[in-house]
Amino acid sequence: MKRLVLLSVGALMLAATVFASVAMAQEGTLDITSATLGTGGSVDVSGTIQCTAGAQYFVQVGVRQTTGNRPYNTGSGSYPVFQPATCTGEPEAFTITVFGGKPFKKGTVLVNGFAQVCDTDSCTFPEAPNEEFRLR
C-alpha cells in the first residue's frame, strides 16, 4: 500500500511537470514597444510577439487619444491582415498602422494589444496592457 501511494505521488508530480511545461510552451508573450504619428493622422504601433515555433498567431492593437472635453478618438488594427502568421520561436517584430475616427494628433495616446496564439491543441491569448506613448 505504501509503495502504491509513493508511486501515485511520483506519477502525479511527473505529470504535473510535463503538462505544465507543455502548457507554458505554447503560451506567447506580446510587447508593444513604440507608437509614432504616421501619415494622414495615423498611428504606427510597433512591437514583438514571441511564441513556440510552429504555432499560429494574430495580433490586434487599439489606440485611444483624448480630444479635450470631447469623446475619445479611437482606432484599432491587426497583423497579419488576412491569415495567421507562423511563429519561429524567436521574437517576431510587427508594425500595425491604426486610423482613428478622425486623425490622431501630437500628444499622448493610450495603446493596448492582445494576441491569439494557437497550436494544434489549444489557444492562448497574451495581452499587452494599456501603456502611454507620446506622439511627436
Sequence positions of predicted segments:
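C-terminal segment of classical bacterial N-terminal signal peptides
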Residues: 15-22
